[in-house]
Amino acid sequence: MKTNRRDFLKMTGLAGAGLAGAGLTGSVHVRNPQQSVDANPADFVHRQHFNMNGYAAPALDTVRVGVIGIGNRGRAALSRLVRIEGVRITALSDLYPEAVEQGLECVREYDHNPALYSNGEEEWKHVCDREDVDLIYLCTPWHLHAPQAIHAMEHDKHVATEIPAAQTLEECRKLVETSEQTRKHCMMLENVCYDFFEMMTLNMARRGFFGDIVHGEGAYIHELLRMNFSKTYYADQWRLKENIDRNGNLYPMHGLGSIAQIMNLNYGDRMDYLVSVSSGDFQMGPHAEKLAAGDDFWKPYVDRNYRGNMNTSIIRTAKGRTIMLQHDVTSPRPYTRIHLVSGTLGTARKYPAPARIATDHTGWVSEEEFHELEERYTPEITRRVGEMAREVGGHGGMDTLMDWRLIDCLRYGLPLDMDVYDAALWSAVIPLSEWSVAQGAMPARVPDFTDGAWESNRPLMDIELEKGGSTRLL
């Protein structure tokens, strides 16, 4: 199947950033392409204004946080942020007043008294205008992340955004450009990079256990059919709508982030090209028909063009490594992110549980040997903060570790563990996979958001806490 110029512009956003009118609406973002010059991923160019790799903003003894989007993830984030030393929640915003009130309940116990904004789709902008906000923490629907992050940086705020950071290549480029021009951090909140086995395998890779890294695999296979077709779980069914008239890997970051760090993508290697293929939709359309037969509410979702059950994307890097990513949030399968690391000296695989390690073809190491490796390669961040993070919670503690390290870096004036180049690159897989699927699995060249700086950039993820690490969990 081939796409014409207009279709490509829709998927990549190269006809314009699509940043206007970014209110807190629950409706799905409709890209509004205009006729423009012919575009191809290989033609995408970013010219660096300032290298944000290793950038350390001035230290903030108290990090004043404005949270925008107080839904499922926003409330969970608030419950974690109030447990971190040096955090002050100064503003909350959501389209729905009841959501803001629920957010207020999350922080009131810890003596935070934030300003509240919920009187319209543009109210979130008032949070960005406030002088008592240092960090904007975004937990809004996907299509709002990039425009809100860009607006926040333009208003002198650091940004931490839920995943994905962007939906189009142009949004990715604009995020990078704005961060470079304003010298404001823009971090995508990829919590899996702080999960315990993922950090252990990163440490193992850095210390040479796997030898030369050859191949990695990641996935987001998580059955969300009932949640997507819920009347209440996602406001105005925004996540269901993201699955209509799109076909690709819509959520690659959970499987990709840790593998990208292990391969030093943006920091000594880079993605070269990607190919992607999707199955047909075997469930979302039929499920919509089944629901609509008994409830007129679901009739607008019948006969829609839903994305395929399974998407598989393969990436090749400049140094010849490969990555396989999968996305399926419909099929009745056990949860998996795979997390496979394959090198010339060893292999690790997290799913299906329990996690395993091997050093030859005869099989996985024994449980006893696994625990010996765990003791040897568990990084300092886990040893120092892991148990407290588990107590605070958030996907077993990784969410808390992520938030804790973000605040710790801001308080001590350190580079963040993940920067805007990571946010852009990992998010770019979404439009690139959509383009490749529509083109019959044709290769899509992956843009270099570092403008060549990847060859000299240094890895950021400080799992050994060589700097900072003194912020307390309360």
Feature annotation, model-predicted:
Residues K2-K157, R173-H185, G468:
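N-terminal glycine-/serine-/threonine-rich beta1-alpha1-beta2 phosphate-ribose binding loop
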Residues L9, L78-S79, L104, K125-C128, ...:
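Non-transmembrane alpha-helical segments in soluble domains
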Residues M11-G16, P33-S36, F44-V45, R75-A76, ...:
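C-terminal helical cap and adjacent loop that interface with cofactors, partners, or active-site loops
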Residues G69, T182-M187, V192-N305:
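Predominantly a Rossmann-like dinucleotide-binding segment in NAD(P)-dependent oxidoreductases
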Residues D156-T168:
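ADP-ribose/adenylate-binding Rossmann-like module
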Residues S313-K319, G343:
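Active-site beta-strand termini and strand-to-loop segments that position acidic
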